[in-house]
């Protein structure tokens, strides 16, 4: 094992169980313990901070940018030998597109690959982590091509992405990542 990601989308309440507060500081309590255990086993294994779900504040989630800032306020900046896991999903928007439009799936910076990359890097830079690598541990474009019927109402944007968009945008996202300094692996 060369790398371990500590958790997945900890800013979603459905991923959270227990009594530790549901916020970035609560995640850092768990990350601190995991980091110490991993480092006791291996001084060189890559430790990846759990990738956040790109979302705003809802009953089931904390805005990913807010959650990341909470993590920094709780000590994330003290770690120099880690990578930041990110999930820069882009709904029905091309990877180089930036916010905002009026269609409902393009009216929020959370819905844009490019905005997600830029905003995460900015928050990292503000907290002295400009050199830290970002690992894209989830990304991609969903399509409804080949499925019968219609997607649920909140997933109608999938009708705007065909299989060719999905393939081409994935390739372009890899190209964007390869051009960025401090970009780690992209899954």
Which sequence ranges carry the predicted segments?
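Noncatalytic carbohydrate-binding groove/subsite architecture in carbohydrate-active enzymes
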Residues: 1-2, 22-164
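Asp-box/WD-like beta-propeller blade repeats and closely related beta-sheet repeat scaffolds
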Residues: 6, 18-21
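A short acidic, helix-capping loop that chelates divalent metal ions and anchors anionic groups
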Residues: 13-16, 93-95
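Substrate-gating cap/lid alpha-helix
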Residues: 165-173
């Amino acid at each position: 094992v060369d790398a371990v990601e500590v958790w997945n989308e900890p800013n979603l309440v459905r991923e959270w169980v227990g009594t530790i507060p549901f916020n970035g500081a609560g995640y850092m309590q768990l990350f601190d313990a995991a980091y110490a255990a991993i480092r006791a086993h291996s001084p060189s294994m890559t430790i990846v901070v759990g990738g956040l779900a790109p979302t705003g504040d809802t009953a089931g989630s904390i805005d990913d940018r807010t959650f990341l800032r909470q993590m920094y306020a709780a000590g994330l900046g003290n770690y120099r030998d880690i990578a930041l896991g990110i999930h820069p999903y882009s709904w029905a928007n091309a990877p180089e597109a930036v916010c905002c439009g009026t269609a409902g799936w393009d009216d929020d910076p959370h819905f844009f690959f490019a905005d997600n990359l830029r905003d995460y890097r900015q928050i990292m830079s503000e907290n002295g982590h400009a050199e830290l690598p970002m690992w894209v541990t989830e990304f991609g474009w969903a399509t409804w091509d080949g499925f019968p019927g219609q997607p649920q109402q909140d997933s109608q944007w999938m009708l705007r992405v065909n299989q060719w968009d999905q393939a081409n945008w994935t390739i372009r996202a890899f190209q964007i990542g390869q051009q960025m300094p401090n970009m780690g692996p992209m899954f």
